[in-house]
């Protein structure tokens, strides 16, 4: 009788474990079943005059420094870019009214967001959805002045 009770207890434990795993899997997907996991979560760095072109985009015409910045890209294409204190140090402020972000996948697939307000103190937040290719290898995010997709003033990295 003990063997049956022990077997039943093990079976019940296995069912509970599988149920918990299934609940976790469904919780990490959106309503369409697309995983919501991060494919990029990285700090942002201001561009310097010595920085190279990245993915066909050139660095801004002045050096930029940033107090704090992060970019987060989820597998479903949701993008959040937080920028604090992105300024031109020789000016002590940001002269631009708006900025946008460019997501790069596979070293060449670029997707640019709509422009958002960019304060004189260098603060901005981009919250957008971008259509990602089926595979997004080596993702990167670049911050663009105004809606100029050919230039970057900050990029993910260190």
Per-range role (PLM):
Residues 66-68, 78-80, 123-127:
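Intrinsic-disorder/low-complexity, polar/charged segments enriched in Ser/Thr/Lys/Arg/Asp/Glu/Gln
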Residues 29-31, 65, 100-106, 128:
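Mature extracytoplasmic/periplasmic regions of secreted or cell-envelope proteins
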Residues 29-75:
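Transition segment at domain starts
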Residues 70-109:
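Mature extracytoplasmic domains of secretory-pathway proteins
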Residues 20, 62, 72-74, 92, ...:
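Sterically constrained small-residue positions within well-ordered secondary structures
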Residues 109-158:
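Helix-rich interaction surfaces within compact, conserved domain-sized segments
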Residues 2-27:
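Secretory targeting and sorting signals
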